[in-house]
């Protein structure tokens, strides 16, 4: 049975990824700082992991075992809405830790297992991380951390290409989650189902790409 490691799986998109993959018979390793009743009800393997704890993230590969078919680095934070003072700047730094550095460290930590399975490494990004698409400004911490994630994942895809691993970043759309709000047009089920179709279709030619949940390629 194929296996998937999902971060930030206690709610929102991460929970929906865990629900859908579990329903399809995958062996799911779900991580979160704290679990939730909804996640516990799925009956999947739940591991505590705080993405702010970089030592724990970097050593997580030993908890995966041999062979990893899919990593979905989903956990993230919005960070401060503006950066106008030293306190905001500290929040910006923490946003980079969670949204950029920790996902990359985790991908590196599980790379040996992914190589064994010729697996896929997926970073959940956002269209707000596209420099070309930024026509409205604002949200400095979130935008910049996701733009950096995109750049890191692009390099990761190049670095792992010879080992048979496929790596890409995905934009889930504007989704009804705690981050997206209730006015968002997409439900988590729709977004995740779309992203799963994109993931299924990824091959070496698409590695290093940036795609929306509907398969549309997004400019960097």
Describe each PLM feature range.
Residues 42-55:
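Rossmann-fold cofactor-recognition segment
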């Amino acid at each position: 049975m194929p296996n998937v490691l999902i971060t930030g799986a206690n709610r929102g998109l991460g929970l929906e990824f865990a629900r859908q993959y579990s329903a399809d018979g995958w062996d799911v390793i779900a991580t979160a700082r704290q679990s939730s009743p909804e996640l516990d009800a799925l009956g999947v393997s739940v591991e505590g992991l705080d993405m702010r704890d970089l030592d724990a993230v970097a050593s997580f590969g030993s908890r995966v075992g041999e062979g990893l078919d899919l990593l979905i680095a989903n956990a993230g934070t919005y960070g401060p809405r503006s950066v106008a003072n030293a306190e905001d700047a500290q929040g910006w730094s923490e946003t980079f830790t969670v949204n950029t550095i920790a996902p990359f460290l985790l991908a590196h930590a599980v790379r040996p297992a992914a190589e064994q399975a010729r697996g896929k490494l997926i970073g959940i990004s956002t269209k707000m991380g596209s420099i070309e698409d930024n026509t409205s400004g604002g949200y400095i911490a979130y935008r910049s951390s996701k733009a950096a994630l995109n750049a890191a994942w692009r390099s990761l895809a190049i670095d792992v290409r010879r080992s048979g691993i496929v790596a890409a970043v995905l934009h889930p759309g504007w989704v009804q989650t705690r981050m997206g709000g209730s006015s968002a047009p997409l439900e988590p089920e729709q977004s995740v189902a779309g992203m799963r179709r994109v993931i299924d279709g990824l091959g070496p030619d698409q590695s290093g790409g940036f795609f929306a949940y509907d398969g549309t390629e997004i400019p960097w």
